[in-house]
Amino acid sequence: MIKVLIIESGSFKNIGGAAKDSLELYKYLSKKPDMQVEIYGSFEELGYKSRTRLDSIYAKKFDILMLNSIRDVPIAEKYISLHEKVACVYVDRGDVLTHHAHAPAKRLLSKAIGLIESRIEPSRLDKATTEIASRSESKLVKAARNYASKVYAIRLFERLKKFMSCYVAINAEQALLARKVLKLKAIEYIPIAPHKEFRKIKVKKDYAGALYVGRLEETQKNVSFMIKGVYRTKKEHKELAGKELLRIIGEGPDEQYYKAMVSRLGLQSNISFLGFKAYGELVKQYNNCGFLVSCSRWESFGRVFIEAMMCGVPVLLNDRNNKLVSVEPERYVVQDRVTGLVYHYNSLRDFADKFYALYSDSKLRARLSKNAYAFAKSKFSIERTYEKYYKLFKDLASRQAQSP
């Protein structure tokens, strides 16, 4: 019997994202006769209350720990200090390896944190800066919070490397980088796949505009750029006055900042804030929109891109967060002018041009929609993803049993 603990108490506590993945993987693995699985985290919004308490974890014996958030490293660190022959699997949903590899200044600062963390717990400082940034409208404060958060994540990754048994990449770029810089035998590439709820359904289509789905925060999601892009599109095409061009689904610390920005730019009739939507309503919104839009500064994968394509929706995104999903043949999440359109990062001109093209050209949308759906159906399967984790855990448990 292989005993697995899935830890999901970090930065993905809301419905969707890693929390949904972890809970569904837990249910899948629990049906396997050779698996005994427990899950720790906050899943109430998904209709499940975990019976595993943090204080009970350390007394139990698990063969494998699975981490989905870098901020759960302290839990795994303490557990492994108390038990032998434990394999730790880290799923890099936050693209921490990429930040670590390409940010030497942040690595130096993270080492400085290492010198003082025995006296000052960095997690408290991280939480405090997050709260300050969420109450501020200053771009400087938000940028400082973003920088501090990455430094803290890099420090946690340094600590994780001392006991990590397996690194799981969720895009092909991560996998290539991991094989270059990590001294690990177990490096796996297991892409995120959309859940079964995301599919084509019949709806009364009455909206050809864009849909944004995600957190309402500036440091990563860059929603202010999207609002400015819609403003520019409207300004250049007078026939769009009064038209609904963008629907925003999601919640987050910068929500009021974005609403004030929309009001200041006179876009109240063009941009709608729909708030949080549960899966059933979200699938309807995907199926009713013309295209999905993203302006993120970075994405480790971009789950919403594949969710949209599974619903037959093309995607507009920038070249910075369009991740590689396969090397041979070379394929990106979005293939420009095949499954969506890709604009140059931070170019309002290019964004506005491509936004208008997707909004105004129904034939273009139809062609991209057909291709996007075919690509998503052929490339991504939640069953294959879960089966890969099952096989990985069996392999790791076998290696642990054979080690001296």
Predicted regions mapped to residue ranges:
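Conserved donor-binding/catalytic core segment of Leloir-type glycosyltransferases
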Residues: 202-221, 227-232
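Conserved acidic donor-binding segment of nucleotide-sugar-dependent glycosyltransferases
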Residues: 333-348, 357-362
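Aromatic "clamp/platform" in nucleotide-sugar-dependent glycosyltransferases that forms part
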Residues: 297
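Membrane-proximal helix-turn-helix segments that form the acceptor-binding/catalytic region
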Residues: 109-167
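Short hydrophobic beta-strand element within catalytic cores of glycosyltransferases
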Residues: 314-324, 334
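Acidic anion/phosphate-binding donor-loop and adjacent secondary structure
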Residues: 176-179, 185-208, 281-284, 399
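Nucleotide-activated donor-binding/catalytic signature segment of Leloir-type glycosyltransferases, i.e.
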Residues: 257-277
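Short alpha-helical donor nucleotide-sugar binding micro-motif in glycosyltransferases
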Residues: 276-277, 284-289
